[in-house]
């Protein structure tokens, strides 16, 4: 008898435990109902009037009406954009700006051209790159860079670049 009780406990432990007050919920399938407000009619039309008929039944506007109205809207929008551009240009002028946030044309040219634009065409931000000119020329001596113009200059200066990473030995192999 004890063996049967032990077997019952073992089988109940292996099944999923369910709370005493739990129950399964079954969902009913939704019912699809078609309700006709008015009796369906067969409407006969030709191909030329089909689009107009569909648009009138669905409540969408006709293309001919919107095509007449669109150019006016586009013209008004274009006119507004032009006016906005003119107004922003006027606001950029020094007399219309705050001193903290507005730079006049001379300050802008000095910032970009450097030295008030006299004789310099590279720009004010490029002035510091002159220090790197020698560094960029020395890059040609390194044979591991896959630049064709640098490889050509390295092979011509093989005696001067032989002390760096094998110099002409590697550049001759890959050239």
UniProtKB/Swiss-Prot annotation:
May function as negative regulator of plant defense. Its main location: nucleus. It comes from Arabidopsis thaliana (Mouse-ear cress). Keywords: Nucleus, Plant defense. This is VQ motif-containing protein 25. It comes from the Eukaryota. It is found in: Nucleus. GO terms for cellular component: nucleus. The keyword Nucleus applies. Plants over-expressing VQ25 display enhanced disease symptoms after infection by the bacterial pathogen P.syringae. The lineage of its organism: Eukaryota, Viridiplantae, Streptophyta, Embryophyta, Tracheophyta. Pfam families: VQ. GO terms for biological process: defense response. Disulfide bonds: none annotated. InterPro entries: VQ (IPR008889), VQ_8/17/18/20/21/25 (IPR039607). A motif (VQ) lies at residues 50-59. Signal peptide: none annotated.
């Amino acid at each position: 008898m004890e063996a049967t009780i032990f077997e019952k406990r073992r089988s109940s432990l292996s099944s999923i435990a369910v709370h005493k007050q739990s129950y399964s919920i079954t969902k009913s399938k939704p019912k699809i109902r078609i309700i006709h407000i008015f009796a369906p009619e067969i409407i006969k039309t030709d191909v030329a009037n089909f689009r107009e008929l569909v648009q009138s039944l669905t409540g969408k506007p006709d293309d001919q009406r919107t095509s007449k109205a669109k150019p006016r809207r586009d013209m008004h929008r274009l006119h507004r954009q032009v006016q906005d551009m003119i107004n922003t240009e006027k606001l950029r002028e020094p007399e219309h700006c705050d001193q903290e946030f507005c730079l006049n044309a001379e300050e802008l040219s000095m910032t970009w051209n450097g030295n008030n634009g006299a004789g310099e065409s590279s720009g004010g931000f490029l002035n510091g790159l002159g220090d790197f000119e020698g560094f960029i020329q020395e890059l040609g001596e390194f044979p591991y860079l896959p630049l064709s113009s640098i490889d050509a200059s390295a092979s011509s200066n093989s005696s001067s670049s032989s002390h760096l990473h094998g110099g002409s030995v590697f550049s001759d192999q890959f050239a």
